UniProtKB/Swiss-Prot annotation:
This is Tetratricopeptide repeat protein 24. Pfam families: TPR_2. Residues 233-246 have a biased composition (Polar residues). It comes from Mus musculus. Transmembrane segments: none annotated. InterPro entries: TPR-like_helical_dom_sf, TPR_2, TPR_24, TPR_rpt. TPR repeats lie at residues 35-68, 72-105, 112-145, 152-185.
Length: 334
């Protein structure tokens, strides 16, 4: 119904609300079926950008899901939705739990996406060192599973985190890697990365000039001292301009990065073996929020698609992960 042009927004909303009322009223229904139902309901609200209603539906689904993989999917959906809403404290808690649960059942691909969502939450909270660590975990998971999109998104996040930490050589390295990996993405993605790479290069060169100016050999006489001081001042000004340009670029990352958030939000398929043949697609990476902002490292969904996956991130990392994808059947925002 959501993908059909035969129905308007009011028709879809009416159908969702009627379905919800029926489920709320009929508690005789098998609890194992209600979990997937409320999760799907949340996915419907998410696609309509009714994010508070999506959170409410996902919270109803969580205690009704019996399998760790299903619980992990709902936790990940909650984390992604809270990221879109700007509730980063709540988002990072849900993503941590989801990453641990995905790891406990060998869902390495899904775990990588949870780490990316967690890293974004941490970066928005200003904890760039922790964000760096989570992006590294996301990159490793993406490499383990051959997830090229996950790899360049993690590299882009690592570049931004490195810049915030003052590690401009690392920022250059990861932006270059991200650009090399995203050749099949839309031109807007490549243009964004080129702009970030250029800003990182300007900042790096300016910082190098400052470092060199500090070690210039001193010469006698006031004239030499004056020239050295002027040179140092010019270099410092150049570095500050480059740094300011980079921060402006990363401020718009709240636009560009928040756009990617709707780039991590993939919709997954279904819950339960009886629904495994359901077709799946996902929205193009990026997209505006109701306020006009864009979300980086989320992918706004167009249809539904699956994932499955229990404890915390550190415990999960110590496990041996399966390289084959295990599907839970629950619709998830990736």
């Amino acid at each position: 119904m959501l993908s059909s042009r035969q129905y308007g927004l009011s028709d879809v909303l009416r159908a969702l609300e009627e379905s919800r009322k029926l489920a709320d009223a009929d508690r005789s229904t098998d609890q194992g079926l209600l979990g997937p139902f409320y999760n799907d309901l949340g996915m419907g609200y998410f696609q309509l950008q009714l994010f508070p209603l999506a959170v409410e539906a996902f919270l109803q689904a969580l205690p009704l899901c019996r399998q760790p993989s299903e619980q992990a999917t709902v936790l990940q959906n909650l984390g992604m939705t809270h990221n879109v809403l700007g509730n980063y404290w709540e988002a990072q808690e849900f993503h941590q739990k989801a990453a641990s649960l995905h790891g406990s059942v060998g869902q390495r691909w899904e775990q990588g996406r949870s780490f990316s969502g967690l890293a974004f939450s941490l970066s928005q909270l200003g904890d760039h060192r922790a964000a760096w660590d989570s992006y590294l975990h996301a990159l490793q998971a993406a490499q383990d599973t051959g997830d090229v999109k996950g790899q360049w998104q993690a590299c882009e996040g690592l570049g931004a985190a490195a810049a915030r930490l003052g590690q401009h050589d690392q920022a250059l390295k990861y932006y270059k890697e991200a650009l090399a990996l995203c050749q099949h993405e839309p031109s807007s993605v490549r243009e964004r990365l080129v702009a970030k790479l250029a800003d990182a290069m300007r900042t790096f060169v300016a910082q190098e000039k400052i470092a060199q100016a500090r070690f210039l050999p001193s010469a006698p006489g006031k004239l030499q001292t004056s020239r050295k001081a002027k040179t140092s001042a010019r270099v410092q000004s150049s570095a500050e301009d480059a740094q300011e340009s980079q921060w402006e670029g990363e401020a718009s990352e709240g636009g560009h990065e928040k756009k990617e958030m709707e780039g991590l939000v993939n919709t997954a398929t279904v819950l339960g073996p009886q629904r495994q043949n359901r077709a799946t697609t996902h929205l193009p990476s990026g997209g505006p929020s109701p306020s006009g902002e864009e979300y980086p490292f989320i992918i706004a969904p167009k249809k539904l698609r699956v994932s499955r996956s229990s404890t915390w991130a550190k415990e999960a990392l110590g496990r041996n992960f399966q390289r084959t994808r295990i599907q839970s059947g629950l619709c998830s925002i990736m």
